[in-house]
């Protein structure tokens, strides 16, 4: 498999084929609002991620944002790269939304790293309103818990 674009560009596109190709230098602190991928997140989502990161830190877990807000052009680039990687639009859509459908473009989705942070957030995220949305993306979270702190059932993938 060849990596197209930047390494961090594929963070949301690659899922079950192996570990996400993200170097720690590509990750942003949830508190670095000068980074547009963080600073352009929906304010409620950003606050929830920051609260979760603080709580995770108390448990010895470092939480980073590997992908947050994305421009429509960047989202389209991710989709185009995924089409090349997976061989078809339909296969790519299992991993990457269109710019019109992506919650990243509206600042309402965030990808969290590393693996221990993903695991921690899957177990504890609902306390902050944060829910894993797709079964094949352990790192993708949205502010989706209901008033009782329950997350919706997982969707199989982004095309669902």
Task: Indicate where each model-derived feature is located.
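Secretory targeting and sorting signals
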Residues: 1-21, 25
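Cell-envelope/glycan interface and biosynthesis
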Residues: 21-160
